């Protein structure tokens, strides 16, 4: 019964996404089918490229690609990290995380408390994954909205993470 409920929830979620962002759903499906890796060779020992999990709205995908310089179907992971902590990209010796448009809307309201808690947890998990992997690599979080970055700066941001406002192109 639980698996049936999960399947129904997944179908409802997919139908909702298809109604509200059909291009995003199609892009995610195509990316999942095509994934073969980018063939990049710039990753330091201890990091690897894997299938990306974050395929939000078209604007969020475009912002992630702007920040990372790679298609959203690619993400970066720490070798040996069973928790599979994801980073959106790696460039110039820095791990990257992109917080796209509409993040401010989500985290600026009273009901955004859970989203802020998830953001704090994500920061902590990223830093912990690097520590477990014995890696000393800086992490840069880029925000498409200055207000979202300012709210995130009030969290307990670990020293390994630096926040930036980078406007979408």
What is each model feature region?
Residues 9-20, 26-169:
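Catalytic toxin/effector domains delivered as secreted proteins or via bacterial secretion systems
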């Amino acid at each position: 019964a639980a698996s049936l409920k999960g399947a129904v929830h997944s179908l409802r979620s997919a139908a909702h996404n298809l109604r509200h962002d059909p291009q995003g759903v199609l892009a995610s499906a195509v990316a999942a089918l095509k994934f073969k890796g980018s063939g990049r060779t710039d990753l330091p020992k201890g990091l690897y490229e894997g299938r990306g999990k974050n395929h939000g709205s078209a604007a969020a995908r475009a912002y992630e690609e702007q920040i990372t310089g790679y298609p959203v179907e690619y993400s970066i992971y720490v070798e040996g990290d069973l928790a599979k902590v994801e980073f959106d990209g790696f460039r110039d010796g820095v791990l990257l995380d992109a917080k796209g448009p509409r993040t401010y809307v989500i985290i600026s309201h009273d009901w955004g408390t859970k989203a802020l808690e998830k953001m704090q947890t994500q920061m902590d998990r990223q830093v912990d994954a690097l520590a477990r992997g014995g890696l000393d690599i800086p992490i840069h979080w880029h925000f498409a909205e200055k207000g979202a970055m300012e709210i995130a700066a009030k969290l307990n941001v670990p020293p390994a993470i630096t926040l930036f406002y980078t406007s979408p192109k």
